[in-house]
Regions:
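Juxtamembrane intracellular "pre-TM" segments in multi-pass secondary transporters
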Residues: 2-20, 199-231
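Helix-loop boundary and gating motifs at the non-cytosolic
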Residues: 13-68, 224-262
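Helix-to-loop junctions at the C-terminal end of transmembrane segments
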Residues: 73-85, 171, 273-286, 371-372
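Cytoplasmic membrane-interface "Motif A"-like loop-to-helix N-cap segments
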Residues: 83-95, 283-294
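C-terminal ends and interior cores of transmembrane alpha-helices
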Residues: 96-109, 295-309
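Helix-loop junctions at membrane interfaces in 12-TM secondary transporters
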Residues: 106-118, 306-317
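Cytoplasmic helix-loop-helix junction between adjacent transmembrane helices
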Residues: 117-158
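C-terminal membrane-cytosol helix-exit motif in multi-pass small-molecule transporters
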Residues: 184-205, 393-398
Length: 407
């Protein structure tokens, strides 16, 4: 097995100052993309259920399937970016596909149409995500990677705040389909920023080998990475999508026209915790922060059933769920580079996202089914039990594995 130092080596072309400028530029790309995406997602669950007539189980299947498609493409694009030594071409392609897809929600006449559009959007996300994360990790030293992902996530989430607020404002003058069409504008700006301001970081090309050769090279003898993927997969088997939080908010009495503001509350909380969680991860350990993220999710699961009778509770639930998303999404990405050499990071991020995608698909379908058939309490009980298992496993990982990689 490679030594810890070998697995965390950096491309010689990156520097902290220039690298953080690249991270900031990528953050701006994500800002405008999330502006576009969250305009759509703030109203999409109700469009699918109320306008198109889907059930909660179908909503879970749509979201889970779309994410599965996305995560599968991340494996392919991540591996290809390692083989070619190029990240940016995949990032540009992915953002362009997503931007072009979302306006077609306006033409959806059934939940099948909505699923196809959602899948197209997620294909774009799948193409770009692993190479983009590898580009972020390649841009800075390993000691600053938590800050880099925290900064990127925070700028990203500022767009996720603006998007639902913009959707709320637009709903005062146009219908939901008009919101879908308007999402094209910020998405196009994102692609332009990416093309003109994000720089490629030169990395060592991986020697030519069959497609799955990268996976073999990545995982051979790398027990820590395999264990980390297993633990993350277990947690993802219990995690549920934000869409269920919005449906629960409606049950708590939030009017449909106000739901985008509940979604904005998720994203405000998500944004506020991004940079602090990245800095804390660099200081106390990324694996410890991951446990904290899992614990916050467990708390949000309990809040799904412990609050009722007051619409204001929905905003508290949204805020706690946003904290979980901010910590988890920042730290789960930041922990990978410690165990992987730079020329295999695209593959590593792709494999990570594939594991998460498959497990998240199962979780969302099962959560929606349990809620429809047995009630919300059964669905939350399932999520909570799985979360406790993942937390326990991560604590063992911290005690047994992390000390071998401590710097």
């Amino acid at each position: 097995m490679d030594s810890p130092d070998d697995r965390s080596n950096k491309p010689k072309s990156s520097s902290n100052t220039g690298g953080m400028r690249n991270v900031t530029a990528l953050g701006l790309v994500s800002f405008f993309t999330d502006f576009s995406t969250e305009m759509v997602l703030g109203v999409l669950p109700f469009f699918i259920i109320t306008t198109l007539g889907a059930t909660r189980a179908l909503l879970g299947a749509i979201e889970g399937s779309a994410e599965l498609v996305s995560h599968a493409f991340r494996m392919v694009s991540g591996s290809l970016s390692d083989k070619t030594g190029k990240r940016k071409v995949f990032v540009v392609t992915g953002y362009a596909v997503s931007t072009a897809s979302k306006p077609f929600f306006a033409a959806s006449a059934s939940w099948v149409d909505a699923f196809l559009v959602r899948a197209g959007d997620r294909v774009g996300k799948g193409i770009r995500t692993a190479p983009r994360d590898a580009l972020i990790a390649d841009s800075v030293s390993e000691s600053r990677v938590g800050r880099a992902f925290g900064l990127h996530r925070t700028i990203d989430q500022l767009g996720a705040i603006v998007g639902p607020v913009a959707a709320f404002a637009l709903l005062q003058i146009v219908d939901i389909r008009g919101v879908f069409l308007a999402s094209l504008i910020p998405g196009a700006i994102a692609v332009l920023v990416l093309v003109f301001f994000v720089k490629e970081i030169v990395v060592k090309k991986k020697e030519r080998m069959p497609f799955f050769g990268n996976i073999v090279a990545l995982t051979r003898g790398n027990r820590p990475l395999l264990l980390l993927l297993i633990i993350t997969g277990i947690f993802s088997l219990g995690a549920f999508n934000f869409s269920f939080v919005l449906i629960r908010a409606s049950e708590l009495g939030v009017q449909e026209s106000m739901i985008p503001l509940v979604y904005a509350a998720i994203n405000i909380s998500h944004t506020a915790i991004g940079i602090p969680s990245g800095i804390a991860a660099d200081r106390i350990g990324k694996e410890k922060m991951l446990v904290i993220g899992f614990g916050i999710f467990l708390a949000s699961s309990v809040l799904m059933i412990s609050m009722s009778g007051n619409a204001l509770y929905a905003y508290l639930l949204a805020a706690v769920f946003g904290l979980y998303a901010g910590v988890s999404e920042t730290v789960q990405r930041a922990v990978i580079p410690r165990y992987v050499a730079s020329e295999l990071r695209g593959t590593a991020f792709g494999l990570y996202y594939l594991v998460v995608g498959v497990c998240f698909f199962v979780s969302n379908v099962l959560f929606g089914f349990l809620w429809d058939v047995y009630g919300l309490s059964a669905a939350v009980t399932y999520s909570s039990i799985v979360s406790v298992i993942a937390i326990s496993a991560m604590l063992v990982f911290i005690r047994k594995i992390v000390p071998q990689y401590a710097k």
